[in-house]
Regions:
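Glycine-rich, Lys/Arg-enriched anion-binding loops that position phosphate/diphosphate groups
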Residues: 6-104
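Phosphate/ribose-recognition catalytic cores of enzymes acting on nucleotide-derived substrates
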Residues: 58-169
Length: 169
């Protein structure tokens, strides 16, 4: 390009890399931050909230059975963040209204699952979202995944997590 600069009457300008904490802001850095659970730093570099877009799949209804119905989002092709619990906001296709919620990204160790899943519980929502496309924006990492001895312990922890997520802006 530089050798054609004079011929084509344009100027090549080499951009300066964007630095964050003396590191070049790059997709590799964002992936590393996400995998370490440093969501807020990754979002700052992205200048937006990291998100996953996927279709709601029918699950085993475990969330519903313990009082927290969830949308199970298909996430097969995504670079994923650290497994854990997150405060999220969700946008439905053809809607401009965000719904706040809480998500578990992980293996559901209390239920001995082997496949990673994204499960989202939406606040103040009831309805059928099966096969609908959702964009899930991750706002805050709340805690890492944990195996509970029983469903009652899990339910108690989910209530604590919900309180944190509801306060997240």
């Amino acid at each position: 390009m530089i050798k054609f600069e004079r011929i084509c009457a344009y100027r090549v300008v080499k951009p300066q890399p964007l630095l964050t904490n003396n590191k070049i802001a790059s997709s590799s850095l964002v992936r590393k931050l996400l995998q370490k659970g440093k969501l807020e730093k990754a979002n700052k570099i992205l200048n937006r909230n990291w998100s996953i877009v996927g279709k709601v799949q029918k699950g085993r209804q475990l969330g519903k059975k313990i009082g927290f119905p969830t949308c199970n989002i298909d996430i097969d092709d995504y670079v994923l963040a650290k497994p854990g619990v997150y405060a999220v906001k969700v946008l439905r296709k053809n809607s401009d209204k965000y719904l706040k919620g809480i998500a578990n990204l992980g293996y559901r160790p209390t239920f001995n699952q082997k496949k990673i899943l994204l499960e989202v519980h939406l606040f103040n929502f009831s309805g059928n979202l099966y096969n609908k496309l959702l964009s899930v924006e991750f706002l805050k990492f709340i805690r890492k995944e944990k195996k509970f001895n029983n469903v009652n312990q899990l339910r108690t922890q989910i209530k604590k997590d919900l309180n944190i997520a509801k306060k997240t802006k």
